[in-house]
C-alpha cells in the first residue's frame, strides 16, 4: 500500500500539480508501517522467576565435595579443582590441577575423579557431591555407557561405589564458586596436581561467604 501511494504521488507531482503533500505522504507511510507490524509474529515474553541460591552446609556427620572443570573453549587448555567441607562449613582440603588441552565435560570428570580419590584417602564415609555440570550428574546417577568418556567415567563410578553413603547433586554455578575458582587456577598450569594445606587467597572470601550462608539471586525461566 505504501509503495503504491508513493508511486501515484510521484506521478501526480511530475505530470499534474508539481507540489508535494507531505502531510498525507507521512500519514500513509506511518499507516503502512503499522499495517506491516500487525502481520509480524509476536515474541512471547518469557516470565522470569527470581530464586535465592547459595551453598548449603551438609547434615551433621556428612562431608560435602564440590568440584568443577574449566575449559574456556571446547577443547582448550583446561583445569579442574574442588574442595571438601564439613557440616559446619569448615574447610577441610582442596585441590587444583592442570589438564592440558581437553573439553569441558572431560575436565569435569577429571575434577570429580580427583575429588573422589581425595575423599577416599581421607576416609569419608558419608559424602554429598555437588557439580554445576548437569550432564555429568546424570551420568553419575545412572549406568549409561559413553565410549567417548571411557575409562574415566568408569573410574568415577567405581570410586563412587566405594563410598557407603553418597549423593550426587546438580547445583547452579553461583553455588559452586569455590570449585570454579580452583578449576581456573588449575587451568593456568599444565599437568600439575596440588593439594592445599591452606585455602589459596582467591577462595578465602568465597569460603566466608558460603560459611555464613549468604545467598544471591538468580533469574530462572518460569
Model-derived features with residue positions:
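Primary recognition of RNase H-like, Mg2+-dependent phosphodiesterase/nuclease domains
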Residues: 1-222
